[in-house]
């Protein structure tokens, strides 16, 4: 039975949207007055057999250095006032199950932060990138895969430079049909971090 092209179309459309949102724009539309920042995040993730075509339970401890570049500052008004930024992440994950191993990657994520409240600022984000898995996970046809993810976060301001970050992410890893088998890992990740 032939595979439906729908997942590939959705993935391509998603990355096209991220690319368009990351393009530079005329400076008269928005000014970049906020400073860029670094953050260090860590957390726990787990895939769920039966969620989509996922068949393996994979558990990870994630360490994520992140660079946050402000693209558009002071957009919108009212409850949706905020800014658009791009996250560049370099995740390293310790795989705990089904075997002890690691995976590494690079993520390019577009984000929108709502700034109505000065102390608590929710944000949404999405994107993806390549990921290399050192573990032999049944159902994964290749070591080099791609990921896409989206999530929600909450930023709490400790002071001008240091902010606490709390995130939930849906995280998908697969080889996009480049090899068989291609059983994806659909995971939830709970992440906390701090900016500096």
Label every PLM stretch briefly.
Residues 1-33:
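Cleavable N-terminal export/targeting peptides
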Residues 25-36, 71-84, 98-100, 116-121, ...:
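Short loop/turn motifs that connect adjacent beta-strands in outer-membrane beta-barrel proteins
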Residues 36-46, 88-92, 124-130, 166-170:
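Transmembrane beta-barrel strands of outer-membrane/channel proteins
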Residues 63-65, 183-196:
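Outer-membrane beta-barrel "beta-signal"
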Residues 46-62:
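Surface-exposed strand-loop-strand hairpins of Gram-negative outer-membrane beta-barrel proteins
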Residues 69, 112-114, 154-156, 194-196:
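Residue-level signature of outer-membrane beta-barrel architecture
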Residues 45-51, 74, 91-97, 130-137, ...:
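Sequence/structural signature of outer-membrane beta-barrel proteins
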């Amino acid at each position: 039975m032939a595979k439906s092209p729908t997942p590939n179309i959705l993935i391509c459309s998603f990355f096209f949207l991220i690319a368009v949102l990351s393009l530079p724009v005329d400076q008269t539309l928005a000014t970049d007055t906020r400073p860029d920042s670094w953050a260090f995040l860590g957390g726990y993730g787990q895939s769920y057999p039966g969620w989509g075509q996922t068949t393996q339970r994979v558990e990870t401890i994630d360490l994520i250095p992140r660079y946050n570049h402000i693209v558009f500052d002071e957009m919108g008004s009212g409850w949706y006032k905020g800014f658009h930024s791009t996250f560049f992440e370099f995740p390293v994950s310790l795989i705990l199950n089904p075997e002890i191993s690691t995976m590494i990657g690079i993520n390019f994520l577009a984000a929108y932060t709502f700034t109505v409240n000065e102390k608590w600022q929710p944000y949404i984000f999405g994107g993806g990138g390549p990921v290399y898995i050192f573990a032999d996970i049944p159902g994964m046809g290749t070591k080099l895969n791609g990921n896409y993810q989206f999530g929600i976060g909450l930023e709490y301001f400790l002071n001008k430079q240091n902010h606490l970050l709390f995130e939930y992410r849906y995280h998908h890893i697969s080889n996009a049909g480049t090899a068989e088998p291609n059983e994806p890992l659909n995971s939830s990740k709970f992440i906390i971090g701090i900016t500096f």
